[in-house]
């Protein structure tokens, strides 16, 4: 689990993906502090080097919102995000609803989410006030397992 001392690494990870299209707003240091207080943030490491992060917020006992997933470009395409999401879904096996938001053009992420049981629930225009639409995805694997 990440802590305030990990904020520089979290900022650096976000900057590392800035060369590619950014599908969500980048957080500043004070926003990372808030994120750490309201939810869980995990630093993904390989050989003690930060290579990504995953953050989520428990909205209620039955609802978790995955607020962020970043993998350093040097480690993308190696199954890092898949492995981390599978572990998270196992950890949250008793949660009835797990959802996340992604850009409709983020085909790699969308394919990953759908392969793990997420379905598109709705499309929201101008979701973060940036003029861009987002897709709200919900994990049906969790919903079906808790019926």
Pin down the residues of each PLM region.
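Short glycine/proline-centered loop/turn elements that form peptide/ligand docking sites
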Residues: 81, 85, 105-109, 126-131
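Conserved catalytic-core motifs of GNAT/GCN5-like acyltransferases
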Residues: 99-102, 114, 119-136
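Conserved GNAT acetyl-CoA-binding A-motif
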Residues: 92-104
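Acetyl-CoA-dependent GNAT
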Residues: 4-7, 11-74, 85-87, 91, ...
């Amino acid at each position: 689990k990440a802590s305030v001392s990990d904020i520089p690494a979290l900022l650096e990870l976000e900057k590392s993906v800035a060369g590619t299209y950014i599908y969500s707003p980048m957080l500043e240091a004070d926003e990372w502090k808030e994120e750490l207080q309201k939810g869980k943030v995990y630093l993904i490491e390989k050989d003690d080097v930060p290579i990504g992060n995953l953050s989520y917020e428990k909205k209620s006992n039955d609802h978790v919102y995955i607020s962020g997933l970043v993998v350093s470009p040097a480690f993308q395409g190696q199954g890092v995000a898949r492995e981390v999401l599978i572990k998270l879904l196992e950890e949250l096996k008793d949660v009835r609803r797990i959802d996340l938001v992604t850009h409709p053009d983020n085909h790699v992420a969308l394919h990953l989410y759908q392969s793990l049981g997420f379905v598109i629930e709705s499309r929201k225009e101008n979701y973060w006030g940036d003029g861009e639409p987002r897709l709200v995805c919900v994990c049906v694997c969790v919903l079906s397992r808790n019926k």
